């Protein structure tokens, strides 16, 4: 079993993106589904689907590429780790990479992107960044 399922999921997405794979499989967890949903709304992935095979759930993620075959993901990083939690106030969530990137934040309103957390006037735990 994986100790940090978020870091494992981000690594699987990063590796699949570097290998130019169309689809990758992630372990199922509610937090991972929430993060992948943010990636989808921001256009970093095409789509995702939760599979239930023999009682074991997994998440199939379709990666997004442009017409030239370049990945929509340039960099994906874990910010808050199990040994070192990182929290961001609302004022620290305004912009990331001049608006090209997104910080995924776990707030009291759920797992959202940094711009949505800023508009909702909440801060929270910065889970990962992507651009």
Swiss-Prot record:
Q: Name one GO cellular component term.
A: ribosome
High-level lineage: Bacteria, Pseudomonadati, Campylobacterota, Epsilonproteobacteria, Campylobacterales
Q: Which domain of life is it from?
A: Bacteria
SUPFAM superfamilies according to UniProt:
Ribosomal protein S8 (SSF56047)
Q: Which GO terms describe its molecular function?
A: rRNA binding; structural constituent of ribosome
The record's keywords, sorted A to Z, are:
Ribonucleoprotein, Ribosomal protein, RNA-binding, rRNA-binding
The record's similarity note reads: Belongs to the universal ribosomal protein uS8 family.
Biological process terms in GO annotation: translation
Q: What does this protein do?
A: One of the primary rRNA binding proteins, it binds directly to 16S rRNA central domain where it helps coordinate assembly of the platform of the 30S subunit.
Subunit text: Part of the 30S ribosomal subunit. Contacts proteins S5 and S12.
Q: What is this protein called?
A: Small ribosomal subunit protein uS8
InterPro entries assigned? Ribosomal_uS8, Ribosomal_uS8_CS, Ribosomal_uS8_sf
Q: Which gene encodes it?
A: rpsH
Which Pfam families does this one have? Ribosomal_S8
């Amino acid at each position: 079993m994986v100790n940090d399922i978020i870091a494992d999921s981000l690594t699987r997405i990063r590796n699949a993106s570097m290998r130019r794979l169309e689809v990758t499989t992630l372990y199922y967890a509610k937090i991972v589904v929430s993060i992948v949903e943010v990636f989808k709304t921001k256009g970093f992935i095409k789509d995702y689907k939760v599979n239930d095979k023999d009682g074991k759930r997994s998440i199939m993620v379709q990666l997004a590429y442009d017409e030239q075959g370049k990945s929509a993901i340039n960099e994906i990083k874990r910010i808050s780790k199990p040994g070192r939690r990182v929290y961001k106030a609302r004022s620290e969530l305004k912009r990331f990479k001049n608006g090209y990137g997104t910080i995924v934040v776990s707030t009291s309103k759920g797992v959202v992107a940094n711009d949505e957390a800023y508009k909702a006037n909440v801060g929270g735990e910065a889970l990962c960044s992507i651009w």
